[in-house]
A protein has these predicted regions:
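Short, well-ordered secondary-structure "scaffold" segments embedded in the functional core
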Residues: 1-177
Length: 177
């Protein structure tokens, strides 16, 4: 069985290395980016430059014989790998990253994925700073927006509620993967 696993792993790595740039490249959506931002703005109001929704997911796996600590997640209480994706308003996964060690936080996946640099390049192509909307696990930054937490006004709470409802589409995308 381990020979099959190794062959499968090598094949997956080859496919990932060979086709990732063509399949999951957010810059392919440069022509649609402003349309995406307009569609999200029409639904969520306050934000005019959001082109998609980002989230991470955890997929359980069998406990490995070696290096168990690397993929163990205390939060999920099990071993597994994490993946990150960005879903655009048209329902397509426009960026996908992983696998990452199960113990890593979503904000680490964002930094490790190189998505920030791709967002910077896309923003330069479009001529406007664009962002993705994420859950509270992501750090707010130039290219990541997230909802208000803690004490906030009624308008801010309503906006967060609207955007979180829209953000559910990224979780539906994980069901396809």
């Amino acid at each position: 069985p381990s020979a099959y696993s190794q062959i499968f792993s090598v094949l997956l790595q080859y496919l990932y290395d060979r086709f990732y740039p063509q399949v999951f490249d957010i810059s392919r959506f440069a022509t649609d980016a402003l349309d995406f931002a307009s569609a999200i703005h029409a639904k969520g109001q306050l934000i005019e430059n959001c082109i998609g929704f980002i989230d991470g997911t955890f997929r359980h796996c069998c406990r490995p014989e070696d290096d168990q600590k690397v993929i163990y997640s205390g939060y999920y209480k099990g071993h597994g790998f994490k993946f990150q994706s960005v879903v655009c308003p048209n329902g397509l996964l426009c960026d996908f990253g992983g696998p990452h060690c199960g113990r890593r936080a979503d904000s680490h996946m964002f930094r490790a994925s190189g998505l920030e640099e791709r967002m910077r390049q896309l923003s330069q192509k479009v001529g406007k700073i664009l962002c993705v909307y994420g859950d509270p696990a992501y750090c707010r930054g130039e290219f990541v927006s997230k909802g208000y937490i803690g004490a906030c006004t009624a308008a801010q709470a309503r906006w967060t509620e609207l955007m979180n409802a829209l953000r559910e589409t990224v979780e539906w995308g994980f069901m396809l993967v």
